Design a protein with these regions (language model features):
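Positively charged n-region of N-terminal signal peptides that target proteins for export
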Residues: 1-5
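Bacterial N-terminal signal peptides
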Residues: 6-18
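Gly/Pro-enriched, hydrophobic low-complexity segments
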Residues: 21, 88, 151-246
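Cleaved targeting-peptide boundary
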Residues: 22-30
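N-terminal mature ectodomain segment of secretory-pathway/periplasmic proteins
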Residues: 30-107, 139-146
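Acidic/charged, solvent-exposed loop-and-adjacent secondary-structure segments enriched in E/D, K/R, S/T
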Residues: 100-129
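Short, conserved active-site entrance elements at the starts or edges of catalytic domains
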Residues: 121-159, 178-181
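Short, low-complexity, Pro/Ser/Thr/Gly-rich segments in the mature regions of secreted, periplasmic
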Residues: 241-257
Length: 257
């Protein structure tokens, strides 16, 4: 009887010890966020990045159609994207308060204000540092969910609940701690949509690393769109008017060649 009690006690102690060791080895949210910030260049470098211009191409329909692409960000929360083909330019912009678009490929050549649901993705694009940096100040909550396989990589998985209730699952590379995938669940026009974005080929813009390969689309959809960035520029001069709803179209300043 005593032997059985001793064996049970030892077994329980081993289980507790193993659980404690596992808990101890699990990184915390703060540790992962700190490593993510450091991987991007550090807090000082991020603060020093006032504007960011990305130039390249947008591939759609499995790469059969190629558009010229440009995105420009300005702190604190302004963004504008342009995609051009055959003399027509699709524009989407957000000035920190409202979003608007020009959709010539759909026969709509005049600027139109975007609905609160339609502008959600653009608001996320306006976050130059991503959802993890300063997450508390943004009103987000972040939870560590362990590791999950991302195309053969055991990535750290973080759940980010935004202030508006939308959820993003952020996957960090276990060695470099940069984002390699973001799965966002948002309510749009009364229905939930899941958008999966894969990020890679990080390059420096000034002193900050940014992804230059971006593939995105609805989760499970094989026909995803891909952005390939050929040029990254940090702290370029930008006028605020390009983000505001215009009475007429204002083109982006072109990158220097």
């Amino acid at each position: 009887m005593h032997l059985r009690l001793l064996i049970a006690f030892i077994s329980a102690a081993l289980v507790v010890s193993e659980c404690f060791a596992q808990d101890k080895s699990q990184p915390t949210v703060d540790e992962l966020v700190a490593k993510n910030i450091e991987a991007k260049g550090g807090a000082s470098a991020l603060r020093g990045l006032g504007t960011l211009r990305l130039s390249g191409k947008l591939l759609v329909q499995e790469g059969q159609i190629q558009l010229t692409y440009m995105q420009i960000n300005k702190r604190p929360d302004e963004v504008r994207t342009e995609a051009s083909l055959q003399g027509m330019t699709q524009i989407e912009a957000y000035d920190g308060k409202e979003g608007w678009k020009v959709s010539p490929f759909f026969g709509r050549k005049d600027p139109e204000r975007m609905s609160a649901d339609d502008v959600k993705a653009l608001v996320e694009d306006a976050e130059m540092d991503g959802p993890l940096v300063d997450w508390q100040a943004k009103g987000n909550t972040v939870e560590y969910l362990g590791t999950e396989d991302v195309d053969g990589t055991p990535a750290h998985k973080l759940k980010v609940v935004r202030k508006n209730g939308d959820v993003s699952f952020v996957y960090l590379d276990p060695d470099h701690f940069l984002e390699i995938r973001v799965l966002t669940q948002r309510i749009r026009h009364g229905a939930q949509e899941e958008v999966e974005t894969d990020l890679g080929d990080y390059e420096k813009a000034g002193d900050v690393f940014v992804p230059t390969s971006i593939e995105f689309g609805r989760k499970g959809d094989p026909d995803k769109q891909r952005i390939i960035i050929d040029k990254v520029e940090a702290n370029v001069p930008v006028v605020d008017t390009i983000f505001h709803f215009p009475g007429f179209q204002i083109g982006l300043p072109q990158p220097q060649r």
